């Protein structure tokens, strides 16, 4: 019993240290890199010179930009043109806020342009990390390839995913996930952030603890995936873990 208690204590210490490291990363100047790129480079360049560089696209009226990420050959980021830190922001559950997940899905075409040929929808995934699972303090959705093993697992669970948030059998990448099936028309009308906040008990009060991802299924529906921070299981709710920025699925 003493050994078990000691092991539990060690796990708690490790979890606290990991959380502390994550917080430290978010308080440094580097955590504002993306925000500076958007607000000090992309947006002014588009407004003054009609040139989105260094972004791939700037849509001031729609409230977003698309930026090629340095990590991986096909990864892009969709970000707002104004200050939103991340999933904890109450703006994301405001109906007047742009539907960033739907906009990010439309921006998947940048992957195909970069690749030189169409990237199948089944190979694409969207993800945003939780407050403790991210390294940047400017809201950004990762548009990238899905890991082949995650793709296979979701295909195998197609029949088990319903229109309600339910635990995904077996989880993903060693972490627990909730899964919810949505149609394209439903996604167009309602943000996944609002679905999570309104349909999962107590989620609205703790949105910053969640990472959220989206993948297209073989029946043309979408599956939303939500994972909640759990320091005891060393889950920082980094939904980006379902992605493979090297795009092995295309080989």
Swiss-Prot record:
Subcellular location per the Swiss-Prot or TrEMBL entry: Cell inner membrane
Recorded topology in the membrane: Single-pass membrane protein
Metabolic or biological pathway, per its Swiss-Prot or TrEMBL entry: Phospholipid metabolism; CDP-diacylglycerol degradation; phosphatidate from CDP-diacylglycerol: step 1/1
Transmembrane segments: 4-24
Biological process, per Gene Ontology: CDP-diacylglycerol catabolic process; phospholipid biosynthetic process
Record keywords: Cell inner membrane, Cell membrane, Hydrolase, Lipid biosynthesis, Lipid metabolism, Membrane, Phospholipid biosynthesis, Phospholipid metabolism, Transmembrane, Transmembrane helix
A cellular component term, taken from the record's GO annotations: plasma membrane
Signal peptide annotation: none
A Pfam match: CDH
HAMAP family to which the protein is assigned, alphabetical: Cdh (MF_00319)
Similarity annotation: Belongs to the Cdh family.
The protein's name in its UniProt record: CDP-diacylglycerol pyrophosphatase
């Amino acid at each position: 019993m003493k050994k078990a208690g000691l092991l539990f204590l060690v796990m708690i210490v490790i979890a606290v240290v990991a959380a502390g490291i994550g917080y430290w990363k978010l308080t440094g100047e580097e955590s504002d890199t993306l925000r500076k790129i958007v607000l000090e480079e992309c947006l002014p360049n588009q407004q003054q010179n009609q040139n989105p560089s260094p972004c791939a696209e700037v849509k001031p009226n729609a409230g977003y930009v698309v930026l090629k990420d340095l990590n991986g050959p096909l990864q892009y980021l969709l970000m707002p043109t104004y200050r939103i830190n991340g999933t904890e922001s109450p703006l994301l559950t405001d109906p007047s806020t742009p539907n960033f997940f739907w906009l990010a899905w439309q921006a998947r075409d940048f992957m195909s342009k970069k690749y030189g040929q169409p990237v199948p929808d089944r190979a694409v995934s969207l993800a945003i990390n939780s407050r403790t699972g991210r390294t940047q303090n400017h809201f950004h959705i990762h548009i990238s390839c899905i890991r082949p093993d995650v793709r296979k697992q979701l295909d195998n669970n197609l029949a088990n995913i319903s229109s309600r948030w339910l635990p995904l059998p077996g989880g993903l990448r060693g972490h627990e996930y909730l899964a919810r099936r949505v149609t394209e028309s439903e996604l167009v009308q309602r943000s996944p952030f609002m679905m999570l906040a309104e349909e999962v008990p107590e989620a609205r009060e703790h949105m910053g603890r969640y990472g959220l991802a989206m993948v297209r299924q073989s029946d043309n529906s979408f599956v939303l995936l939500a994972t909640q921070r759990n320091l005891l299981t060393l889950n920082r709710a980094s939904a980006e873990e379902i992605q493979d920025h090297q795009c092995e699925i295309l080989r």
